[in-house]
Curated annotation (Swiss-Prot):
<dbReference type="GO" id="GO:0009413">
    <property type="term" value="P:response to flooding"/>
</dbReference>
<dbReference type="GO" id="GO:0072708">
    <property type="term" value="P:response to sorbitol"/>
</dbReference>
<keyword id="KW-0808">Transferase</keyword>
<dbReference type="InterPro" id="IPR056735">
    <property type="entry name" value="SUS_N"/>
</dbReference>
<dbReference type="Pfam" id="PF24862">
    <property type="entry name" value="SUS_EPBD"/>
</dbReference>
<comment type="function">
    <text>Sucrose-cleaving enzyme that provides UDP-glucose and fructose for various metabolic pathways.</text>
</comment>
<dbReference type="InterPro" id="IPR012820">
    <property type="entry name" value="Sucrose_synthase_pln/cyn"/>
</dbReference>
<dbReference type="GO" id="GO:0071456">
    <property type="term" value="P:cellular response to hypoxia"/>
</dbReference>
<comment type="subunit">
    <text>Homotetramer.</text>
</comment>
<dbReference type="Pfam" id="PF00862">
    <property type="entry name" value="GT-B_Sucrose_synth"/>
</dbReference>
<dbReference type="Pfam" id="PF24861">
    <property type="entry name" value="SUS_N"/>
</dbReference>
<dbReference type="GO" id="GO:0005829">
    <property type="term" value="C:cytosol"/>
</dbReference>
<dbReference type="InterPro" id="IPR000368">
    <property type="entry name" value="Sucrose_synth_GT-B1"/>
</dbReference>
<dbReference type="Pfam" id="PF00534">
    <property type="entry name" value="Glycos_transf_1"/>
</dbReference>
<dbReference type="InterPro" id="IPR056736">
    <property type="entry name" value="SUS_EPBD"/>
</dbReference>
<dbReference type="GO" id="GO:0006970">
    <property type="term" value="P:response to osmotic stress"/>
</dbReference>
<protein>
    <recommendedName>
        <fullName>Sucrose synthase 1</fullName>
        <ecNumber>2.4.1.13</ecNumber>
    </recommendedName>
</protein>
């Protein structure tokens, strides 16, 4: 109720501000809103609203600038125009939304609740339908018992808030400590108790036993191995799992005694992070071609594959270290669960089980898509996998049980399809679930919710957005690579934030889908594989054996399906980019910027690695981008200054390719219209290559502008090209400028973007959220039932309506 009252007060003050401005600057406000209304029925985005403001006469603008209406205008993310009404979605700060509606004829300002705003917005598509019942999806009532921070600093730092809440609320008296005892007594591995035996039945016995153990251990040398006092511990009711030597066991016992006596957030996190509870991990990534060789650059196969392969190696190292320090002799298992593709010639995608390189306990487990007619053999776009996933989940559960001889301890989903399957598996098996979106498609395709019917035949967004909402509400915790993924920035809406309130007209409206202040959100940034990506200055590690191949790729005069166009001046620095060839990655946009900018063309050559011209693409978007590339080469006469190389699948050689570009004193550019994180940005910076990257999304956080790289706006290509040209001009005048940016990038990576930091954080989060899942289990039952109904009554019919692929 308090939240609702706060929101009404907040909206009311915005309405009053607008009313006051209508009194004091009536003509000026009307001049702007009339321009907006004149655009006719439709949606205006923030940049279009600001453009209308800037088109006003200077005198009119000056009267409004700096006033409350101008602040409201800058915070308005979209305007819905249905003359004579203009509705505004106002976002004063990340995660906080207010809705207003102005009647330009009557000069009436109304405040709207989210459902009212969405209903108004739906009239753009369906017209006025006052009598029709529409399902409203609202998860807010289920969150009443779950703590919610209100401070901006806790967005993406949910575990800190949760630790404070748990230590304050769960441990305020003796009775409230019982969940911790029950949680510790749950832990076992293959029938063998860990930490506590059946002798410990209550809190008094636990505290008494811990004090006895503390006294005993204090007399031992710190390096005394657990085996030497194991029998003594078993006598008093303590089992393995506390540590591998006296020092670690004593430290762990004192942590628990402190928690039982006077809990604090840091002690709680440290203790839960060390509790032995993660031995088997399953990672979901069904779509695309998931393998270790010869797949990068295939449709739907890019950064996510690289991310997961690097992730599992780092997780294995951290798990092995923790298991050893816990005094256990358990072999962990990490399974990457993906789709088996029988016809993926030249790859291992048809093999059921494949060991991950440079690992002992990580495997790729492949399970095929199946229908009543049998196994589906052909590749299927990530937009068309929906009708297969429920059967896939059931088949996967059987295969996992065979491989693990039991249940996993943690299930991690990736992207929309992987997160849906992870949710279904976690629901079925009752285990902790982690969600990683990588990219939420709703933010990539503007207005893809309100106009979903136009796009559904091609993209099936009705399925995907439904799966996303289901998974993000089902999961125990969500990790993102950046703050922007969750809550955007002052100017831009976050990927998750865009799911707070939206509508799919005729299907359902989401009045409260996700709250960016939810403590399940945590920022855990990945790194680059340091064995592949390392600074160009480390001469002894450089893979010079690849240089002749790299020179052939970049500079040979031969034009074929591997490389198109030639570089005439081989002494110029290389402006380099590497990505999938799709609309959002915007490689064709970069080529156009370059083609238009004479100064940049004189200063540097452009090399683009993307798309596979060696074979005919099955992906419609890639085909369209390829045509665009061919047209641009002709339009701007790029041959001589530009090289287009087909996708390169050898990551090791790609690492040396980045370093070779460093040798030319070149730069890397990532021009995406939106990028959730930007793994190639991290890879390039890790090699010491000065990097320019989109300001739309994660790279804006990775790069500190002007120090460790540069931000570019993909929607202002001319400015981006000038920024690139300015850099190369400055480097020509002062070569130390290149070194300065290169070193700044390397320093930034060391501080924040390594897989070691990532894996430590992920396992600690699993401990904390595993405990939270245990203590809040009853409170979450209603939400689970609501999600089950939403899945069965909405998602399943949508998935069944997606056409099945026809094998040739």
């Amino acid at each position: 109720m308090a939240n609702a009252e706060r929101m009404i007060t907040r909206v009311h003050s915005q309405r009053e501000r607008l009313n006051e401005t209508l009194v004091s600057e009536r003509n000026e406000v009307l001049a702007l809103l009339s321009r907006v209304e004149a655009k006719g029925k439709g949606i205006l985005q923030q940049n279009q609203i600001i453009a209308e403001f800037e088109a006003l006469p200077e005198q009119t603008r000056k009267k409004l600038e700096g006033g409350p209406f101008f602040d409201l205008l800058k915070s308005t993310q979209e305007a819905i125009v249905l003359p004579p009404w203009v509705a505004l979605a106002v976002r004063p700060r990340p995660g906080v939304w207010e809705y207003l509606r102005v009647n330009l004829h009557a000069l009436v300002v109304e405040e709207l609740q989210p459902a009212e705003f969405l209903h108004f917005k739906e009239e753009l598509v369906d017209g006025v339908k006052n009598g029709n019942f529409t399902l409203e999806l609202d998860f807010e009532p289920f969150n009443a018992s779950i703590p919610r921070p209100t401070l901006h600093k806790y967005i993406g730092n949910g575990v800190d808030f949760l630790n404070r809440h748990l230590s304050a609320k769960l441990f305020h008296d003796k009775e409230s400590l019982l969940p911790l005892l029950k949680f510790l007594r749950l832990h076992s591995h293959q029938g063998k108790n860990l930490m506590l035996s059946e002798k410990i039945q209550n809190l008094n016995t636990l505290q008494h036993t811990l004090r006895k153990a503390e006294e005993y251990l204090a007399e031992l040398k710190s390096e005394t191995l657990y085996e030497e006092f194991e029998a003594k511990f078993e006598e008093i009711g303590l089992e393995r799992g506390w540590g591998d030597n006296a020092e670690r066991v004593l430290d762990m016992i004192r942590l628990l005694l402190d928690l039982l006596e006077a809990p604090d957030p840091c002690t709680l996190e440290t203790f839960l992070g060390r509790v032995p509870m993660v031995f088997n991990v399953v990672i979901l990534s069904p779509h695309g071609y998931f393998a270790q060789d010869n797949v990068l650059g295939y449709p739907d196969t890019g950064g996510q594959v690289v991310y997961i392969l690097d992730q599992v190696r780092a997780l294995e190292i951290e798990m092995l270290q923790r298991i050893k320090q816990q005094g256990l002799n358990i072999k962990p298992r990490i399974l990457i669960l993906t789709r088996l593709l029988p016809d993926a010639v030249g790859t291992t995608c048809g093999e059921r089980l494949e060991r991950v390189y440079d690992s002992e306990y990580c495997d790729i487990l492949r399970v095929p898509f199946r229908t009543e007619k049998g196994i589906v053999r052909k590749w299927i776009s990530r937009f068309e996998v929906w009708p297969y996933l429920e059967t896939y989940t059931e088949d996967a559960a059987v295969e996992l049980s065979k491989e693990l001889n039991g249940k996993p301890d943690l299930i991690i989903g990736n992207y929309s399809d992987g997160n849906l399957v992870a949710s279904l598996l976690a629901h079925k098996l009752g285990v902790t679930q982690c969600t990683i979106a990588h990219a939420l498609e709703k933010t990539k395709y503007p207005d893809s919710d309100i106009y979903w019917k136009k796009l559904d035949d091609k993209y099936h967004f009705s399925c995907q957005f439904t799966a996303d909402i289901f998974a993000m509400n089902h999961t125990d915790f969500i990790i993102t690579s950046t703050f922007q993924e969750i809550a955007g920035s002052k100017e831009t809406v976050g990927q998750y934030e865009s799911h707070t309130a939206f509508t799919l007209p005729g299907l359902y409206r989401v009045v409260h889908g996700i709250d960016v202040f939810d403590p399940k959100f945590n920022i855990v940034s990945p790194g680059a594989d340091m064995s592949i990506y390392f600074p160009y200055t480390e001469e002894k590690r450089r893979l010079t054996k690849f240089h002749s191949e790299i020179e052939e790729l970049l500079y040979s005069d031969v034009e074929n399906k591997e490389h198109l166009c030639v570089l005439k001046d081989k002494k110029k620095p290389i402006l380099f980019t590497m990505a999938r060839l799709d609309r959002v990655k915007n490689l064709s946009g970069l080529v156009e910027w370059y083609g238009k900018n004479t100064r940049l063309r004189e200063l540097a050559n452009l090399v683009v690695v993307g798309g596979d011209r060696r074979k005919e693409s099955k992906d419609n978007e890639e085909k369209a981008e390829m045509k665009k590339m061919y047209d641009l080469i002709e339009e701007y006469k790029l041959n001589g200054q530009f090289r287009w190389i087909s996708s390169q699948m050898d990551r090791v050689r790609n690492g040396e390719l980045y370093r070779y570009i460093c040798d030319t004193k070149g730069a890397f550019v990532q021009p995406a219209l939106y990028e959730a994180f930007g793994l190639t940005v991290v890879e390039a910076m890790t090699c010491g290559l000065p990097t320019f990257a989109t300001c739309k999304g994660g790279p804006a956080e990775i790069i500190v502008h002007g120090k460790s790289g540069f931000h570019i706006d993909p929607y202002h290509g001319d400015q981006a090209a000038d920024t690139l040209a300015d850099f190369f001009t400055k480097c020509k005048e002062d070569p130390s400028h290149w070194d300065e940016i290169s070193k700044g990038g390397l320093q930034r990576i060391e501080e924040k973007y390594t897989w070691q930091i990532y894996s430590q954080r992920l396992l600690t989060l699993t401990g904390v959220y595993g405990f939270w899942k245990h203590v809040s289990n009853l409170d979450r039952l209603e939400a689970r039932r609501y999600l089950e109904m939403f899945y069965a009554l909405k998602y399943r019919p949508l998935a069944q309506a997606v056409p099945l692929a026809q094998d040739d």
